[in-house]
Design a protein with these regions (language model features):
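Short beta-rich binding modules
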Residues: 1-254
Length: 254
């Protein structure tokens, strides 16, 4: 089966930059995970695509969905300030996974249609569904920086079709950074190491030697992970708006 990202026009800079910033809720930390399934999803109303990872962390499942293309199916956008063509952040994120795990860009991975059990929100249970999978990632290890967040509970407004805050909150997890499976280095740190050797990152990828280069990166090069842990480990990030509750207070006082 063809890879929908194969041949996509991407920006020259394909390296995700470093910014410190379902199986139950994980505390904020870095975890080693096995990739159970990696598959492509599509929006119902457009050509937008996402990639979902089902991860096994010590027998517990963590699901991560990342949108990698816009409604037209493009993976790039034009920066309004500079006019520069850049990759969408979601594409760079999933491209970093492909590079760290398989040593290839996302568009160069082999894909295969498989039937896997996925949660169906209408049926409210897991059902067998056919999805396009990145099978080269299946069974491989990766390290993930997981953030615990408090967010709004939402409910669909039948008149507008939009999902709006109910005034209640729930906790969820979000993966904010991926690292190599065997050591805590990001793809950006790998690229810097390759540059320090006088080589070009793209040349190393194209020659099929990226995984070998990752193995050679010294442990002390993994600066981002230690800084992220120092700043974030154990924290809960409140991203809720309190919108519904605020509206209720306003109504009561009016």
């Amino acid at each position: 089966m063809s890879n929908v990202f194969a041949g996509k026009k991407i920006a020259k800079d394909t390296i995700e930059e470093d910014y410190v910033g379902s199986g139950g809720i994980f505390d904020t930390d870095i975890y080693q995970a096995k990739i159970k399934t990696a598959y492509i999803g599509k929006a119902q109303s457009s050509e937008a695509r996402n990639v979902t990872l089902l991860l096994d962390i010590n027998g517990r499942e963590l699901r991560s969905q990342t949108w990698v293309s816009n409604k037209n199916g493009d993976v790039t956008y034009r920066d309004k300030q500079t006019g520069e063509i850049k990759n969408l952040p979601g594409y760079n994120t999933m491209n970093s996974v492909a590079l760290l795990v398989a040593g290839k860009n996302l568009g160069d991975l082999d894909t295969e249609e498989l039937v896997v059990k996925l949660y169906d929100f209408e049926a409210k249970k897991e059902l067998p569904q056919a999805v396009t999978c990145f099978t080269q990632l299946h069974g491989e290890m990766i390290n993930v920086a997981v953030q615990r967040q408090t967010v709004d509970k939402t409910k669909k407004n039948d008149s507008t079709g939009d999902y709006e805050p109910t005034g209640e909150t729930r906790d969820q997890n979000e993966i904010v950074k991926f690292f190599a499976g065997e050591k805590l280095v990001t793809i950006s740190e790998v690229a810097e190491f390759i540059k320090s050797l006088g080589e070009k990152f793209d040349d190393v990828v194209d020659s099929g030697h990226l995984l070998k280069a990752i193995r050679k990166v010294p442990e002390e090069a993994g600066i981002f992970a230690s800084k992220w842990l120092e700043r974030n480990k154990g924290q809960i990030y409140d991203k809720s708006t309190g919108k519904k509750a605020a509206e209720g207070i306003t109504s009561a006082l009016s």
